[in-house]
Amino acid sequence: MATVTKSIGTSSRDYSTIAAWEADLDSSSIYSSGDDAVGELYNDSVFVEDIDIDGGGSIGLDTITLTSSDTEGNRHRGIKNSGPIVRHNSASRDFIEVAGNATVDSVTISFIEFDGDDDSVSNGDDKHCIKYTGATELYFQNNLLHSWGSGQDA
């Protein structure tokens, strides 16, 4: 099937938040069964939000990818503040949660800087920096992850 790429950012993008893009992963007006959904972050804003990827199953997506655009100057260079940044929004929940399902083959998260915002609030053993559940394969690659407080589980 098709690869459907949507831009995420503030300057003339398809979506202004990651949550809005994720909410449309089950939209039949955008995707068809077997499609590969790609959300591309742009370095024109800091995304202050927690990520929860659990869509795409009812429409039958093949893969889901959240990455930064590969346009020149947009991807991080292995150092802080050199590409799209997602900053932890809530000390009361997991920062990145992927709840896969049997119909989506894989979820890939790549080339993004994740800033825990120095969250040192302990919320017990049930809060994580990255939480993964489900049957979907998860690939977390070429990301920067920093400032995750000592009170949280990694």
Positions of PLM-derived features:
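Extracellular beta-strand/beta-solenoid scaffold signature
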Residues: 50-52, 89-100, 120-133, 151-154
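Right-handed parallel beta-helix
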Residues: 67, 104-116, 136-149, 154
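Acidic/polar low-complexity surface segments
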Residues: 73-91, 115-123, 147-152
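The right-handed parallel beta-helix/beta-solenoid scaffold, focusing on the short coil/turn
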Residues: 35-37, 49, 62-64, 94, ...
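Short, T/G/N/S-enriched strand-turn elements that build extracellular solenoid repeat scaffolds
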Residues: 18-32, 47-58, 77, 97-100, ...
